[in-house]
UniProtKB/Swiss-Prot annotation:
CDD domains: PT_UbiA_COQ2 (cd13959). Its cofactor is Mg(2+). The chain crosses the membrane at residues 24-44, 60-80, 105-125, 154-174, 192-212, 234-254, 258-278, 296-316. This is Polyprenyl transferase dpchC. The gene is dpchC. It comes from Colletotrichum higginsianum (strain IMI 349063) (Crucifer anthracnose fungus). The keyword Nucleus does not apply. Keywords: Membrane, Transferase, Transmembrane, Transmembrane helix. One of its GO terms (molecular function) is transferase activity, transferring alkyl or aryl (other than methyl) groups.
Amino acid sequence: MAATKDRQLFRHLLRLSRFDRYNPLFTTFAGLWSTLLAGGAKMAEQRSDMSVATVFQQCALCFVASYLFCGAGMVWNDWIDRDIDANVARTKERPLASGKVTATEAMVWMVLQAALSWGVLEVMLDGKDVAKHFIPVAAASVLYPFGKRSLARMLGIYPQYILAFTIAWPAVIGRAAIYGQYESYAETLRQCLPLCTMVFFWTIYLNTAYSYQDVVDDRKLGVNSFYNIAGKHIHLLLVALVSPILVCLPIYLFELHSLWLWLSWMGVWTASLAQQLVQFDPKQPASGGSIHRSNFILGIWTILACVVQVFLTGSA
């Protein structure tokens, strides 16, 4: 009986971290892209001892660190929002909102995941600047649920800003996994700025479309969300958010000198984003969910494109 209850609790904890869904994988994309392409660039340098195996090893560590920390962030979000979630149709069955997991159990689970994520970063970065890479995303994750409150809206702060930062930040960690021992923290930030900016706006775009599914319930409860800034012009807002994506991505790709990436990343993303904007229907909030899924597929595709780039560099 006790074993059965433990298994049920473990399943609920996995659900609490969204490990039963694809959403946490979004937090791994920027780190994986950055690690793979930094690894490819390092391999292309003269007298480089970087191997394909090392690149993939660092890539795996970056994935685990990001995935675990995302799980911790999901728990924190639900811990803060449990009373709100209990009154929203889409979220009322979440483990904390429904009472399947207690607040104490959730907090212990969150701390465990955050500690494991820190440990993985220690290994990946060889102990260098771990706090500098961990604290910014931790602080943003703590603030995220409060960005949905009415006070945040009055201050011009929307939760999508904070979420976008947390999803873009692993790009910095990914580059540090390859170049961290060879360049300063400030230089890593500078090199990652175009990619981070691109991912920042990409995340706001896809999350604005995704959260628009809850527009009816959110307006009843006064939940703050970025689509509020557009009013009835949500479609125009999404178009505006796509624009900086298509500006920053070429800036990042220009330094990599890869025709393959221009075709497989810039080309595919441009076509896909255009198709998404055509298919989005403001009168059908559920259409925001299809944009979310389409961008998940784009993220997976881009990982594969970056893997190919590593092998192209390794064989050159």
